[in-house]
């Protein structure tokens, strides 16, 4: 006869982890807000901000001024990546994600209440406040993506980082679709005068609901296993930005240029195409000629494209796990280079050609954007990962995104067609192709064990 004896020693507690569902929602909600805010601004910058905040300029100058204000956020983003990266690598991912969400959320709501420059006393103040809000948005955005990417990938099971990394990336198509649906609903229920007077403010004010939901979810998170290991190993960097530039500056340069084509494609597809699509075929205000689509019709076409964006973002994760980040992205980047040369024939192909351009462009966007949430963090050890991934991502935003709408309008006006805009995209893709060619594969790095720079 045997007697089982139960030890009185306490069992080792199972480490607490974030559930897959919580990781999905918490990483997705912030980037959804980020891109919702971006597209709300980009749409307003194309459609109403030139007249509201720069009323004394001609059509082209007002549009360029509107996009210049748009670009201020991208200048602020690297500063935000350093600021929030510092706390993300020293205090933790969770706390920093809450702070970045609050920063960009408050700035977005304030944009929704700025008086137009035509109001007495606001001729100079209104555009200045707009620029200040865009700067604050940029600071918050600079810390948002890196934290969301780490939340997903540092909680991912081994061999599934690229798949889990698509969670925050899905925020881009979701945010765009939400913003477009809001603008369509407003445009269909308001007159042009009502939309210009107050309707454009609704998307900015409505974002407060998303911010509240995001804060509620993120406050329930626990810290990621990777950062916990850094703390336990006493490997927390004193000054993460100094440490990452001292030990990993080549990886920052590599990551920046790897992201270049993604950002260029992204902002040409979402900002330039809308502006070109709805511009009059025979403008009388000095603006370059466009396709003359009704605003609502073109927004629906963009929504169709964004659906493909979301689907192929999801598809990119398994592909990047199977074939590797580098190999997959080399093929996709080559496709982007060819796509840039198709701008003119597709834009000239009527509605079918334009819709095909949007579907193809957004498909490539999903395939190139999806793996980035795994690839960029994989370049850096855990104790400087938040700072390193964020800095590379946001430096690329200046080179590939901040100037893209501005340069695109200038090239469009110079050539009186989108031909040079397409060449511009092809050049950015060529630069990214070289950066990828020089970068080693990151799929098999010791992601959880690589703690110290």
Where are these predicted regions, by residue range?
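Extracellular/periplasmic helix-loop-helix junction of adjacent transmembrane segments
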Residues: 45-77
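Multi-pass alpha-helical transporter architecture, strongest
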Residues: 214-221, 427-453
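A late C-terminal transmembrane helix in Major Facilitator Superfamily
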Residues: 383-414
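Helix-to-loop junctions at the C-terminal end of transmembrane segments
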Residues: 81-93, 312-325
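C-terminal transmembrane helical hairpin of 12-TM major facilitator-type secondary transporters
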Residues: 326-371
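Glycine-rich segments within core transmembrane alpha-helices of 12-TM secondary carriers
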Residues: 163-187, 393-404
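C-terminal ends and interior cores of transmembrane alpha-helices
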Residues: 102-122, 334-349
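Extracytoplasmic gate region of multi-pass secondary transporters
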Residues: 42-43, 249-309, 400-404
């Amino acid at each position: 006869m045997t007697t089982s004896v139960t030890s009185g020693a306490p069992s080792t507690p199972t480490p607490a982890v974030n559930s897959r569902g919580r990781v999905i929602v918490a990483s997705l909600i912030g980037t959804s807000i980020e891109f919702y805010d971006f597209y709300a601004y980009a749409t307003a910058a194309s459609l109403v901000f030139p007249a509201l905040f720069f009323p004394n300029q001609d059509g082209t100058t007002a549009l360029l001024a509107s996009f210049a204000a748009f670009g201020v956020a991208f200048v602020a983003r690297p500063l935000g990546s350093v600021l929030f990266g510092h706390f993300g690598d020293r205090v933790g991912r969770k706390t920093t994600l809450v702070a970045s969400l609050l920063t960009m959320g408050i700035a977005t709501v304030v944009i929704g209440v700025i008086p137009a420059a035509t109001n007495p006393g606001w001729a100079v103040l209104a555009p200045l406040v707009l620029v200040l809000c865009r700067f604050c948005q940029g600071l918050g955005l600079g810390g948002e993506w890196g934290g969301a990417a780490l939340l997903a990938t540092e909680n991912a099971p081994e061999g599934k980082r690229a798949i889990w990394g698509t969670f925050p990336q899905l925020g881009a198509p979701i945010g765009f679709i939400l913003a477009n649906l809001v603008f369509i609903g407003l445009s269909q229920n308001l007159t042009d005068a009502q939309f210009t007077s107050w309707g454009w403010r609704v998307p900015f004010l409505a974002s407060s609901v998303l911010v509240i939901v995001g804060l509620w979810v993120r406050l329930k998170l626990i810290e990621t296993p990777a950062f916990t290991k850094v703390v336990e190993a006493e490997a927390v960097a004193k000054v993460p930005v100094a440490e990452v530039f001292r030990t990993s500056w080549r990886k920052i340069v590599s990551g920046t240029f790897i992201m270049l084509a993604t950002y260029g494609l992204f902002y040409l597809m979402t900002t330039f195409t809308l502006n070109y699509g709805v511009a009059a075929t025979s403008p009388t205000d000095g603006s370059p000629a466009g396709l003359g689509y009704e605003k609502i019709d073109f927004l629906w076409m963009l929504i169709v494209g964004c659906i493909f964006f979301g689907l192929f973002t999801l598809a990119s994760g398994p592909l990047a796990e199977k074939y590797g980040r580098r190999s997959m992205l080399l093929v996709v980047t080559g496709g982007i280079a060819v796509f840039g040369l198709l701008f003119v024939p597709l834009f000239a192909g009527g509605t079918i050609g334009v819709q095909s351009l949007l579907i193809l462009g957004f498909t490539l966007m999903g395939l190139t954007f999806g793996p980035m949430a795994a690839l960029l963090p994989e370049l850096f050890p855990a104790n400087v990962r938040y700072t390193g991934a964020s800095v590379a991502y946001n430096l690329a935003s200046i080179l590939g995104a901040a100037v893209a709408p501005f340069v695109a309008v200038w090239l469009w006006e110079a050539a009186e067609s989108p031909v040079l805009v397409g060449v511009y995209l092809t050049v950015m893709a060529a630069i990214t192709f070289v950066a990828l060619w020089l970068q080693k594969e990151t799929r098999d790095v010791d992601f959880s064990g690589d703690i110290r720079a």
